[in-house]
Amino acid sequence: LISAEVLFSSVGWILLLALIQILIAIFRKPLIKLYVFLITILELASLKKRLMAIPRMTAAMPASFGILCIAVFITGLCTSWHNKTAFHKLMSGKTIGEVEHTLTEKDHAVLYLPIYRLDFSIYANQLAAHQITQLIRAAHTVKVDSCSYRSPNIVLIIGESYGRHHSQQYGYFMETTPRQTALEKSRKLTKFTDVVTCWNLTSFVFKNMLSTHVIGEKGEWCDYPLFPEVFRKAGYNVTFITNEFLPQAKEAVYDFSGGFFLNNPELSKLQFDHRNTQLHDLDDGLLKDYDDSLKTFQKEHNLTIFHLMGQHVNYKLRYRKEQAKFWASSYEEKRPKLTTAQRKMLSHYDNATLYNDSIVAQIVKRFQKEDAVVIYVPDHGEECYEEDRGFICRNHSANIDWPLAHYEFEIPFWIYCSPKYIRNHRDIYRQIRKAKDKRFMT
């Protein structure tokens, strides 16, 4: 026999559940019939009450329903009026860049209905298609009469979200760029001291950096050829290795705006001979792409473009944890006004900058024995609790004051010349050294 102690223990509950399951299995059909009978009785009773209430409801319905509809309409209009005006502004943009900039505003439209999102997608693609047409037309105007190939190997590294005030090279109190600093001391790397970006939004920078259009000239960036097209026409083998702008599902409008002219099939063929095909969690994946396949396509004259993810938010995802050198406690003396959480965020950014230093140094290493020149430039700066401004990333305001210009537009920039390049092109090397303090915009 089973004792009472066993019945009221955990084992007893399991036995009870098993017994219930056995009874349900044995009496399943009678139980189903009983359930159906009870449900039918309840539904008939409910139906009778509803039928008796119909005359009263019908009499009051026209007026009540009309008032309710008006109230709902007025309430909906009042509560969503701001979003409707914001949606109208969004859909009034003349270029995809203008639309993107509108979306950076704090009070931008929220596309909460599927029909809104569909409408916006069609509109954005139409705007992009118009600029694609202009770019293709401009590309076919490119003519190169001759080329000296004085620089047989040109490497362009485009960084991401890198303010120069977090660079050891530019006087930052943390050792975030030890490898670049060492290259600078060797005089192979020339640091430029007064360089600003043309914008603090990646897509805007990419369009203006890759276009031969100069800000201030007539027309738009898409009215002029893209410089990789010019290099291809001149006979250079052009390789583009990006960790950000590849066509992918669920692409944000910012990535679409920055990459649509790179990923259009016709424009891609006009600009690049070779490209990578996948994105990576960390930028060392681009090095593997280059070493495993893209390096084999190098020819006598090459332009190789590396586009890094760099220090883009989320900062803690931009470096390997085992390579971390900075911690929240590292900033207690230098940044005493920051909270522990803010210091932790700052440590993530500086660790990402240190990791970026290692990636850039690895790229330089791959070309140091070639007759090569390597150019490094990030797309724009970045803020990470600078002074008492209290925020990270960027403020995409059209009103540019001094702090915003200082932290988000001032960027590091340098040119590395390999020993072989210096020997073969001393005149170019001297010109680079002479130009290091000149002002210019990317």
Q: What is the meaning of each model-derived region?
A:
Residues 1-102:
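Transmembrane and membrane-interface helices of multi-pass
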Residues 71-336, 410, 442:
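Active-site-proximal alpha/beta segments of enzymes that process anionic O-linked groups
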